[in-house]
């Protein structure tokens, strides 16, 4: 779910914190991708003409595999170095939210069964998306494919967006790609949404900057976290009657939830045993690994392994799979492809024509020369 209403609130109070762009603008960037969000989108969106998820000849869902394969190829062709982060065990404080989702999914399934029985195809298509969910088996299948493609996969201790944020904070990745805005609350400097949208939707990618949010709002990180808790997060309930604008104004005036509660009108109902402090602690100190010395590795493409898995085991079209592999090979064969291949190298300033002709080698600037440049 993320943070309720945060994107709309930022559009009002911190408009400069969000900018729109295209996927090619991230060429050369290492992006931490919330795998569960991406796979869920493929299960929901990649469907046949009847609205049902794509399956193999044995009736097993394959939408997540085919979607991940082609989307990853597109990212790599755009010069992006993807890192897929998978969910670990959710925190206990999220149990209430997960139970609500389970109940909603069961209701949606009952409505879907009824729509199918009555032959209401349009309603059935809508409900199929609401009942979509990723299983552990599907997650493992995606991991296997990515490993064959040579793409790094990271298993989170807890929730994926927290680990994505940790990778960004450690300088290993530029941004977190997710639809969950709580990646900002967890400390990711940049969060990109609509990152996995298909080209035919023509939706711009939206990038949010945490430092810009704090600068425009005048909030500290702790105050921003308290705002997100008031808006509504996955870890605790909210104060009934306090909407997004009121929440913003309360934090702006009183600086913390503790002070808000001291001055809050009796017309607002505060949840009993409200665990906002525990939620705050989860945002400030999420259960993540230390990535300071962690090395991300993009391995060699296993061409035969991919064919064995996708064509032999999963029964995908061999010609299409081969074309996909060729696209990956073509990208890797282009040595001088800008930031993708020289991402970790230092760019040298070329010599001028006169310097090159005379065989001059540039000297490193002296301390005095450096000081002179600074003054200019």
UniProtKB/Swiss-Prot annotation:
InterPro entries: 5-3_exonuclease, 5-3_exonuclease_C_sf, Flap_endonuc, HhH2, PIN-like_dom_sf, XPG-I_dom, XPG/Rad2, XPG_CS. Residues 1-105 are annotated as: N-domain. CDD domains: PIN_FEN1. GO terms for molecular function: 5'-3' exonuclease activity; 5'-flap endonuclease activity; DNA binding; magnesium ion binding. Mg(2+) 2 binds at residues 180, 182, 234. It holds the Pfam family XPG_I. Mg(2+) 1 binds at residues 34, 87, 159, 161. Keywords: DNA damage, DNA repair, DNA replication, Endonuclease, Exonuclease, Hydrolase, Magnesium, Metal-binding, Mitochondrion, Nuclease, Nucleus, Phosphoprotein. Residues 123-254 are annotated as: I-domain. This is Flap endonuclease 1.
